[in-house]
């Protein structure tokens, strides 16, 4: 389906050269998110001559495109706005790859586990938000999310460090000798969401396996503050930890625990949620009593790269989800989001249009900081639209109105089977029925403030 970006832009409401936010007024939140979403789509190349459907302009990589579509799925949900549905659907389906598992040929030489995971998280959100279902049931949102999970868990590497996912999928890519929190945290996160949606406890088993490995190797540290470190080199049995902390890693683990507590009601997942939330304070700067989000490992040194400039987007999204799934967290998270949204609104005053969003939200009285990009737009959109998270239903499940059809064996295509199968039980259902199958396959296979 071809869908004109110019038509999309024309459907956005008109705006003046400023963003004014009243966090208690749904109309201003909607209008501001409308403006910011339009700015986000200015970076989209998929409807332009020579562009690739689903991809944003250089220098934004494939994984960040998956993150951006996840943001726009929530945008359509929070504001009950179906304007972007055809555009988002085309993007999500075009990039699935021949085996419908988000390993497309155009990314086969560079794709990492974390890259694939962010597309999986996007389609998982589509299932949970009852986003318009694809006409082809074999490409249902839940099925695609299961395909990503299945192909990721098949790469679980017990030959080094007693488990864990490598950062990279393919041996020729730099980072194949690194096991990082974003890849493993995303597997944990997807497992938690699939467990809650399908009711299949085999996903809980996988979530626990990933959690225990990350804890055992030292990527998760249990102290007064619960740190989530960036990753480990496989040399010396993964004993050399890279002690950077990134907000999106904290968010992946936090929301994953929240999903598991909401589903299992096990006290340990509640306790982990609270501890991770307490330690998330490191990603907020106290500005005269306002707690404003920032990327602590790179913003103070003005060294955030294009990827890192989008991390606050996913962190905001995962905070919003946590506040819904574990209501006890709502007061703290709401204050953080409100304070940060005010800061973000102050930063969205740059560019030739007067509404381009910047990176820094902590100096909003100074306005735009001169930085711009897909990550800046996405982050501002997410922190503002998550002010609406309690105005709309919680993420749906197969038992509470979710209509996406699942396939527990999705994603393997023609691959041979020799991996430990995922147990399928009667609870693994989606939409109209239960699909049972045996899964089996294998694939080839970043301080409290900065660094401790």
Swiss-Prot record:
Family to which the UniProt record says this protein belongs: Belongs to the glycosyl hydrolase 76 family.
Induction: Induced by HAP43 and up-regulated in absence of CYR1.
The protein's name in its UniProt record: Mannan endo-1,6-alpha-mannosidase DCW1
Lipid-carrying residues in chain (GPI-anchor amidated glycine): 431
Pfam families in alphabetical order: Glyco_hydro_76
Record membrane topology: Lipid-anchor; GPI-anchor
Record has Glycoprotein as a keyword: yes
Name of the coding gene: DCW1
Residues bearing glycans: 25, 81, 106, 130, 200, 237, 240, 262, 271, 286
Signal sequence coordinates: 1-18
Propeptide: 432-452
Function: Probable mannosidase required for normal synthesis of the cell wall.
Organism: Candida albicans (strain SC5314 / ATCC MYA-2876) (Yeast)
Keywords assigned by UniProt, alphabetized: Cell membrane, Cell wall biogenesis/degradation, Glycoprotein, Glycosidase, GPI-anchor, Hydrolase, Lipoprotein, Membrane, Signal
Gene3D superfamilies found in the cross-reference section: 1.50.10.20
Chief location category: membrane
EC number: 3.2.1.101
Subcellular location: Cell membrane
Organism phylogeny: Eukaryota, Fungi, Dikarya, Ascomycota, Saccharomycotina
Reactions that this protein is recorded to catalyse: Random hydrolysis of (1->6)-alpha-D-mannosidic linkages in unbranched (1->6)-mannans
BP GO terms, sorted: budding cell bud growth; carbohydrate catabolic process; cell wall organization; fungal-type cell wall biogenesis; regulation of filamentous growth
Gene Ontology MF, one: mannan endo-1,6-alpha-mannosidase activity
GO cellular component: a single term: plasma membrane
First-tier enzyme category under EC: hydrolase
């Amino acid at each position: 389906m071809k869908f004109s970006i110019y038509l999309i832009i024309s459907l956005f409401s008109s705006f003046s050269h400023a963003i004014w936010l009243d966090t208690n007024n749904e109309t201003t939140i909607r209008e501001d998110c409308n403006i910011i979403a339009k700015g986000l789509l200015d970076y989209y190349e998929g409807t332009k001559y020579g562009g690739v459907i689903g991809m944003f302009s250089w220098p934004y990589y494939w994984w960040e495109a998956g993150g951006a579509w996840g943001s726009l799925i929530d945008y359509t949900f929070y504001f009950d706005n179906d304007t972007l549905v055809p555009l988002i659907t085309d993007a999500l389906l075009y990039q699935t790859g021949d085996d419908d598992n988000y390993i497309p040929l155009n990314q086969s030489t560079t794709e990492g586990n974390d890259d694939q995971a962010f597309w999986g998280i996007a389609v998982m959100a589509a299932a949970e938000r009852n986003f318009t279902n694809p006409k082809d049931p074999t490409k249902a949102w839940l099925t695609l999310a299961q395909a990503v999970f299945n192909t990721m868990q098949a790469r679980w590497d017990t030959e080094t460090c007693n488990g864990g996912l490598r950062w990279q999928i393919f041996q020729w890519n730099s980072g194949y000798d690194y096991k990082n929190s974003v890849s493993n945290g995303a597997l944990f996160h997807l497992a938690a969401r699939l467990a809650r949606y399908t009711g299949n406890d085999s996903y809980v088993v996988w979530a626990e396996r990933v959690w225990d490995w990350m804890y055992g190797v030292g990527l998760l540290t249990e102290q007064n503050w619960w740190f989530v470190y960036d990753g480990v080199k496989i040399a010396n049995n993964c004993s050399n930890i890279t002690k950077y902390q990134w907000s999106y890693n904290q968010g992946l683990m936090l929301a994953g625990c929240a999903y598991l507590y909401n589903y299992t009601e096990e006290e340990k997942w509640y306790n982990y949620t609270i501890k991770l939330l307490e330690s998330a304070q490191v990603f907020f700067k106290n500005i005269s009593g306002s707690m404003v989000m920032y990327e602590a490992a790179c913003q103070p040194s003005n060294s955030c790269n294009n990827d890192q400039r989008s991390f606050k987007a996913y962190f905001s999204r995962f905070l919003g989800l946590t506040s819904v799934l574990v209501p006890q967290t709502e007061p703290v998270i709401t204050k953080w989001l409100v304070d940060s949204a005010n800061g973000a609104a102050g930063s969205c005053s740059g560019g030739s249009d007067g509404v381009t969003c910047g990176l820094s939200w902590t100096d909003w009285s100074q306005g735009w900081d001169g930085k711009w990009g897909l990550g800046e737009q996405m982050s501002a959109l997410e922190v503002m639209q998550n002010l609406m998270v309690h105005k709309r239903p919680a993420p749906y499940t197969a038992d509470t109105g979710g209509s996406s059809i699942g396939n527990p064996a999705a994603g393997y295509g023609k691959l041979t089977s020799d991996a430990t199968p995922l147990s399928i039980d009667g609870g693994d259902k989606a939409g109209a029925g239960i699909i049972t199958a045996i899964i089996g396959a294998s694939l080839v296979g970043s301080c409290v403030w900065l660094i401790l």
